[in-house]
Amino acid sequence: MRLKANKTWSQQQLAIKLRLHQDPAPGLFSLERQHLFILAAKTALAATLCWWLARAFGFHEAYWGSISAIIVLQSNVGSTITASRDRILGTLIGAAFGFSFSLFGALPWNYIGALLAAVILCGLLGLRNSSRLAGVTITIIMLVQKAGSRWGLALDRVGEVMLGIVVALAVSTFVFPDRARVRLRDGLVQEFLILGALFEAILEGFPASPSGDLSSVRQDALAMLRENNQLLESARSEPSGGPGWNEGLNTLLQFGRSLFDALVALEFSLEGSHQDGYAQQLEPALGKLAADIRSGFHHLAGSIHEWRFDAEPPPMNLEEDIEQLEKQMEQVRHTGIGFSQAEILRAYAVQLHLKQIARLLRASRVETSRAVGEGQN
């Protein structure tokens, strides 16, 4: 299965990373900088619009709304929603504690008490990111000397923050929206293609010398796993994109981690195998399974890109490959007397890891198909 010609930004970045082609727009108008320019324009639009609306609504300090819009506007809709939630909760908690503690006691003791109470409450509620914002709100309400009541100052602060958040959410959602779940889907395409590249780099060292790119490809795969895990949190904050979107994305992330662990185990099992000869006795079954695993990574990446997982890849059958490899091992078992015990054990370990990777690949497609509800009425 081939990926569509109109690749997304992240897929084009992967092609550049794997040296499949050069950046089509180098310099000032590269793909990465285009994304940066759009985010900068959206931030400027949100801040300016919020300042204008705040003045129109009669807020005395319109700049606080602009500050809120700048803080919560993130690179994708899901992250913006998460940041908005944290800021709303932090502002409400800070306003409540700032006003309440200003009614009794004297500075600085009531201020210290308000900060302690707000931070502890946020910690107990699991609102770690909101605790800092609550502290900022308390500081403004209790320490900024202004005419008027503390209650009025608290209400103004909440109103300005709410306005900034509403404007930021509107701009993020309707002006060149960048959905976290779509970016995560593209990130998963990258992840499984990089895992396939890692698999190929590992097998280059069996029974030859290890690939020179192995370490860098492994680091790329690990970085992609971490980035996609962060995107999942943002994707969960977005409105659902359809039946099974979040379930499917979460399933693929879990299998991606399992496949990475299996590939690392395969790499360890191949240490010292550059002169092994026993594994040659397992050909062509071993080579056929390895080739189909390579194709399996690319097929799964294509399925993620199309978001369809119910089509069995016609030219390969991983379970049949495993069965043929087991038969081949049974046939050559008597030839092991001419090889070292370490060499034989290494060959057995390799075939076990290959079988595990093959079954994980198949299970990732089948389980994701079930998670997204394919074939259900």
What are the language-model segments listed below?
Residues 1-38, 183-249, 261, 265-377:
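Long, hydrophobic alpha-helical segments that serve as membrane-spanning/inserting helices
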Residues 1-225:
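A transmembrane helix-and-boundary motif of multi-pass membrane transporters/channels
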